[in-house]
């Protein structure tokens, strides 16, 4: 038995407004489940899925506010400069430009419409790189 994938679940104060941001600014497509018992919207781009849920409050607290640091999601990617340029051209707030971290990842971070920080990363671990390549075949 092995684990296959993981999805981020983001509560949001305005599920439609947040969905529009992800579709228009980040290039995701949406699938709505608003008639389901637990209403949600799934967002897809390439092999990434994010799930939005309607929050019971008008304010969302990202990890950095709750715990002092940290992004709210890591998305493994490639062609980061192109992706950062794409987001920048669409007016997405880039809070950390593309850089190499002290743990040898290449990453940049954006802030979504609700204040969540999403990091787009290329992990430098050879094991991880080989694993990702093997799953794409």
Language-model segments: what does each one mean?
Residues 1-7, 29-78, 84-111, 122-137:
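Vicinal oxygen chelate
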Residues 12-15, 102:
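Conserved beta-strand-loop-alpha-helix junction that forms the acyl-donor binding cleft
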Residues 14-15, 78-80:
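Helix N-cap motif at beta-to-alpha junctions
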Residues 18, 22-23, 87, 115:
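Conserved active-site tyrosine of GNAT-family acetyltransferases
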């Amino acid at each position: 038995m092995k684990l296959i994938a993981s999805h981020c679940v983001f509560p949001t104060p305005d599920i439609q407004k947040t969905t529009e941001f992800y579709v228009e600014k980040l290039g995701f497509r949406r699938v709505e489940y608003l008639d389901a018992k637990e209403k949600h919207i799934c967002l897809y781009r390439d092999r990434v899925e994010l799930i939005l849920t309607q929050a019971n409050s008008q304010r969302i607290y990202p990890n950095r506010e709750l715990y002092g640091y940290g992004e709210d999601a890591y998305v493994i990617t490639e062609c980061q400069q192109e992706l950062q340029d794409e987001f920048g051209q669409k007016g997405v707030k880039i809070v950390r430009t593309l850089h190499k971290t002290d743990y040898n990842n290449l990453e940049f971070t954006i802030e979504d419409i609700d204040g969540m920080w999403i990091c787009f990363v290329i992990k430098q671990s050879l094991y991880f790189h080989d694993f990702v390549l093997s799953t794409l075949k």
